């Protein structure tokens, strides 16, 4: 009897830009599968996706995305996702809620691990337990004693709504849709999240998590048939639901005949905070792929610093800087283009709108400079031809779902090169393609909103008051019915018991894990680099698509304290100012038309003996036919940069100020860690000067009048004279032929010879040896806290380092997750050991002192209780997995170079890997005791919290750390 085909092949399509075949299948259940297959792909990935349409702001899709991984019919443990974090070799593991879809992607370089991940994801998504206790944990819960509310999603979104830019993004999207999915925040608004009922939550799952609403994207080198058989066995056969015929298409909105003017309040960071103006257009459907890609390119053109549109609007003085919202949003069925200014003059929204339209009309009239268009398109061409690194399949999947979930073939939105060629052909025929887009989607498009965002101290207060009002009403209502109140208390008590309950060994044992023999025991060895000592140059030959890479390293040995603060502006200015021979517009066009990519950064490094090896790094890459041109351009920038271009310097300085100002909420945990580490090591102190709260405060106070700009320019000149020096410079060059490497070597030699010698003395700073450990509480305007504690620990060459590194993984992916995230309600918690410092931190945390207690209690538990052999093995898998990821050859070469500079040998790395395999439960018990001693002997604490949390927990804080701490406010 002939075997019936389970899946019908709809099409087979070759995707040229990725040298891959795309197989598109449909199952009779309605489930669709697309497999993008190529033997060149280094990791295998899958993504299970559903269209999920919100009808309110309760964040039900978001809460469901979190709760999906709280146990399933086959894997009844409380958090299978946590076991994947600590016990798989994954290269990607996540779940994401978008405005109109929810996706569940994962990836691994090991085929067996890939199918293990797929197995757990499949059962979690299609057969979840969805217990009420999980709903309360991940969504929100109300304590019957005081009717205070908490929950992971609730706290996450409180943090999000404390962030000005996040709030603006959400308001802009909803402003263009008077009805339908995009009117609502799929993540949830805190005031509405507490309205979500458990029954509505279950109904949402039943409606949207069906086979006919499911799309599965596969990417990698595994066999297509093997994947389809897996899906049939683990998804389709166990599926119990009846087929649903619910229509979940998103209707296009009716276009307006006239734009709308709106006003909203946003959080006021300080008394001097200024507002934001934005104008936002609803553009085109995603199925108009050419224009969608065209609008993406147009967005880059309009927002380019050399475009007259941006230049003239900034010159107007209406606002200080381009708003973060500016650009194209293609995550929706219909795209949105926004342009905005931040720190604006009050009551100038009409002038702002008129100026935007006037400058757009001028661009159409005078035409966009061809060199600008050519440069932007060159960047796209280069990106398509460059070797792809880690998580490249995930980016492809997200891009595919934009069209696939809205009725297009899954490969359509991946065919970027085809549509760019179509656009290029039109340009070559003399068609003013981008000017036509400006007219069609911006100038003559009446479906737009002009929004004034006014800073107010009332926004968060009003949100808290609304939450309190709802909770009070809920309390009165529940307490009026004794039976209902009794059930309410029972539910909460059951929830707390659930959180404290341990998973059974029998349930844990059901999880599919890799065997010990599946784990790579040998490290990936460093690459052999060729060295030319007299030039301080290393080189590496590798297969590339006729692309070369150059990494320049300038030592930072001659800097003083203030110099480090100016580094942030210095690295921006090098890319964004005029030079002796070129205006800013001309040098910008040359960069875009010559370099495929340029990146300027700094590294704060120590070698294995603790010697500081900090460097200022300039990396660039391009096609082989642009070697000489690229080096000439870099030479022009390094030697002839004009820091005294005051008009442009002012714009860059204001942009830096605004970027620093917006760091607090999205990067609060990193700022707390930087601050905490700064009293423990000189290098951490220097890093904090540049990138931390010290740097932020300095630039917030910086003035931009003419005299101040002259002083800044002189500082930058001085900094250049200390860094861009012949005897400071070393390099790593990479290319695909001996001839190219020789060309690169010659050009590097010429560059080096054109630089001046140093006449400075080593200026490394000293950290005050008598400085006390930091105890600092920083008051910020946020409804959530960011806590960090750091302390001296083991360096990489210490015999205890492998055990401490293993403990880091146990804390980060195990006990901190349980105590701080699951039970504490924080959005995240971390542990890391690097350069002899152990760091613990929490992110978007509703707690303050409780988190510090949780850090220490976690260590106490591990010191007082032995882990099992099975637990050790699970963590071993995950720890090995943190060292396995997809790297390009260029990345491998750069890593090898850095290891050589830091004296980290392959033999040391192999010794550490070997040690991981010998670690026992007793070792973890002992190392936990040692780390506990370390944290108690000498630690440094920094917390970013709001004033209310601080006042409420002040007494607890002083019991924990005493009264000797500093208190400061920042905005």
UniProtKB/Swiss-Prot annotation:
SUPFAM superfamilies: LuxS/MPP-like metallohydrolase
Record-annotated disulphide pairs: none
Molecular function per GO: metal ion binding; metalloendopeptidase activity
One of the GO BP terms on file: protein processing
Residues forming coiled coils: none
Protein name, UniProt field: Uncharacterized protein BB_0228
Organism: Borreliella burgdorferi (strain ATCC 35210 / DSM 4680 / CIP 102532 / B31)
């Amino acid at each position: 009897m002939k075997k019936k085909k389970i899946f019908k092949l709809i099409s087979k399509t070759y995707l040229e830009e990725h040298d891959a075949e795309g197989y598109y299948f449909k199952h009779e259940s309605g489930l669709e599968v697309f497999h993008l297959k190529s033997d060149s792909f280094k990791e295998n990935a899958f993504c299970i996706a559903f269209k999920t349409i919100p009808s309110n702001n309760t964040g039900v899709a978001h809460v469901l995305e979190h709760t999906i991984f709280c146990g399933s019919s086959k894997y009844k443990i409380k958090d299978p996702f946590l076991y994947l974090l600590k016990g798989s070799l994954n290269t990607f593991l996540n779940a994401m809620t978008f405005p109109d879809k929810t996706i569940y992607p994962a990836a691994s370089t090991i085929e067996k691990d890939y199918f293990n991940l797929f197995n757990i994801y499949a059962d979690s998504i299609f057969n979840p337990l969805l217990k009420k206790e999980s709903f309360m944990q991940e969504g929100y819960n109300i304590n019957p004693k005081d009717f205070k509310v908490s929950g992971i999603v609730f706290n996450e979104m409180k943090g999000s709504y404390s962030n000005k830019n996040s709030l603006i993004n959400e308001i802009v999207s909803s402003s263009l849709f008077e009805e339908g999915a995009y009117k609502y925040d799929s993540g949830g608004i805190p005031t509405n999240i507490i309205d979500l009922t458990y029954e509505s939550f279950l109904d949402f799952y039943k409606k949207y998590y069906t086979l006919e609403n499911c799309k599965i994207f596969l990417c990698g080198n595994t066999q297509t048939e093997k994947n389809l058989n897996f899906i049939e066995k683990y998804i389709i056969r166990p599926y119990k639901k009846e087929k649903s015929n619910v229509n979940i298409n998103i209707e296009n909105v009716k276009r307006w005949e006239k734009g709308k003017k709106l006003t909203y309040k946003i959080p006021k960071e300080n008394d001097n905070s200024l507002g934001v103006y934005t104008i936002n257009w609803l553009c085109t459907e995603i199925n108009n792929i050419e224009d969608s890609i065209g609008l993406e390119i147009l967005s880059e053109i309009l927002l380019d610093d050399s475009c007259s549109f941006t230049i003239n609007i900034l010159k107007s003085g209406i606002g200080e800087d381009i708003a973060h919202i500016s650009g194209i949003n293609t995550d929706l069925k219909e795209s949105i283009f926004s342009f905005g200014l931040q720190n604006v003059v009050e009551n100038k929204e009409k002038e702002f709108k008129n100026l935007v339209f006037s400058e757009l009309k001028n661009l159409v009239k005078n035409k966009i400079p061809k060199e600008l268009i050519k440069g932007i398109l060159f960047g796209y061409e280069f990106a398509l031809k460059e070797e792809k690194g880690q998580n490249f399949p995930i980016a492809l999947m997200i891009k595919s779902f934009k069209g696939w979930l809205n009725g297009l073939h899954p490969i359509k939105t991946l065919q970027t090169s085809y549509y760019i060629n179509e656009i290029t052909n039109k340009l070559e025929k003399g068609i003013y393609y981008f000017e036509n887009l400006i007219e069609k989607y911006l100038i003559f498009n009446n479906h737009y909103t002009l929004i004034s965002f006014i800073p107010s101290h009332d926004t968060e207060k009003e949100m808290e008051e609304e939450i309190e009002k709802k909770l009070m009403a809920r309390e009165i209502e529940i307490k009026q019915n004794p039976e209902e109140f009794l059930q309410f208390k029972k539910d909460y008590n059951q929830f707390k018991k659930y959180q404290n309950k341990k998973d059974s060994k029998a349930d844990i044992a059901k999880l599919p894990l890799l065997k010990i023999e599946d784990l790579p025991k040998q490290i990936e060895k460093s690459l052999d680099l060729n060295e030319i000592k007299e030039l301080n140059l290393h080189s590496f030959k590798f297969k590339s698509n006729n692309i070369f890479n150059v990494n320049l390293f300038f030592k930072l040995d001659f800097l003083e304290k203030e110099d480090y603060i100016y580094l942030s502006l210095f690295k921006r200015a090098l890319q964004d100012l005029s030079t002796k021979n070129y205006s800013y517009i001309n040098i910008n066009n040359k960069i875009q038309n010559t370099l495929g990519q340029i990146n300027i950064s700094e590294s704060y490094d120590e070698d294995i003996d603790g010697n500081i090896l900090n460097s200022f790094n300039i990396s660039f890459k391009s096609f082989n036919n642009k070697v000489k041109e690229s080096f000439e351009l870099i030479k022009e920038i390094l030697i002839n940069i004009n820091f005294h271009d005051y008009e442009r310097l002012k714009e860059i300085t204001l942009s830096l100020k605004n970027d620093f100002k917006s760091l607090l909420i999205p990067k609060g945990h990193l700022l707390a860690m930087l601050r905490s580490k700064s009293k423990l090591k000189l290098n951490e102190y220097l890093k904090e000067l540049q990138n931390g709260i010290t740097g932020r405060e300095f630039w917030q106070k910086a003035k931009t009048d003419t005299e101040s700009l002259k002083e800044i320019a002189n500082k930058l000149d001085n900094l250049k004279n200390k860094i861009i020096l012949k005897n400071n410079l070393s390099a790593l060059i990479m290319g695909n032929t001996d001839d190219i490497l020789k060309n690169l070597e010659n050009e590097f030699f010429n560059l080096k010879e054109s630089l001046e010698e140093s006449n400075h003395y080593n200026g490394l700073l000293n950290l005050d040896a008598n400085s006390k450990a930091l105890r600092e509480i920083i008051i910020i305007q946020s409804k959530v806290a960011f806590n960090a504690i750091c302390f001296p620990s083991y360096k990489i060459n210490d015999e205890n380092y492998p055990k401490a590194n293993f403990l880091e993984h146990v804390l980060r992916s195990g006990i901190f997750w349980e105590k701080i995230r699951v039970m504490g309600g924080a959005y995240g918690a971390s542990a890391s050991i690097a350069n002899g410092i152990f760091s613990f931190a929490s992110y978007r945390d509703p707690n303050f002192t409780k988190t510090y207690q949780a850090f220490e209690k976690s260590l106490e538990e591990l010191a007082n209780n032995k882990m099992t052999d099975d637990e050790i093995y699970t963590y071993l898998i995950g720890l090995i997995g943190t060292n396995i990821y997809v790297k390009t050859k260029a990345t491998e070469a750069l890593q090898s170079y850095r290891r050589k500079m830091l004296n980290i040998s392959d033999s040391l790395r192999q010794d550490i890997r070997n040690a991981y395999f010998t670690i026992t439960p007793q070792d973890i018990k002992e190392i936990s005791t040692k780390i506990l001693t370390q944290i108690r002997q000498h630690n440094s604490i920094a917390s970013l919290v709001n004033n209310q949390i601080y006042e409420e927990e002040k007494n607890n804080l002083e019991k924990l750390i005493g009264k000797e701490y500093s208190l400061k406010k920042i905005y």
